[in-house]
């Protein structure tokens, strides 16, 4: 599988570089022959996919069709680790993904893994949209050769389990699946649970076979992964926001004309606002499905 992913990334890189380097003074014109690339590790029918596709639409609209972008969803060209690495080294120009896997490469992003820092999504969004705060966060990304264009979200992460949770003591001993993030693991350990990093593709079977007792994810993922079929309770822990970053390789961005940079920046903001609206609608819809 790694060989296949490597080949795909190499092919995509060749097209992207042709689009950007063939006429370095005017990448937008070159992009008419070869589309730019944006990738994520989620299905198209998720907020991540919506965020990605809206950006593609907005870039094409704002450029009057002069700039074309090809979206690769669902980990087609690699999982979270491969995507952030590929964006940092310039193989893939644009990436949309959760910030948690990025903290393994950009340690300062662990600020977003501080549990219980926010319990209201609107307060969090106001912070993320603050120009001064975003400038500081962007500097952290720039230290690692990528630029933060916009930050959306899938609301908060919540817990599902077959055990009724009424107090902190009820978390003790619960074998809960988490992402591979040391800060997430530390949080669950601190309240007595037994966190187990596991690929999401293994979660449904893990719950079915009893390898794990519980898991934590945004509502949308609980529904799309049919987790509710194996779990009796949703515990509204809201312990962490599920943030979605849209990043671009800094060298790629710097080769764009001033006009195209403005198009990219505005398209990212438009996609952020639209995806947040869709997220809020989908939370209500997903809750009705779970109930």
Range-by-range predicted roles:
Residues 1-35:
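Short, low-complexity disordered leader/linker segments with a strong preference
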Residues 21-123, 132, 141-291:
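N-terminal secretory/targeting leader peptides
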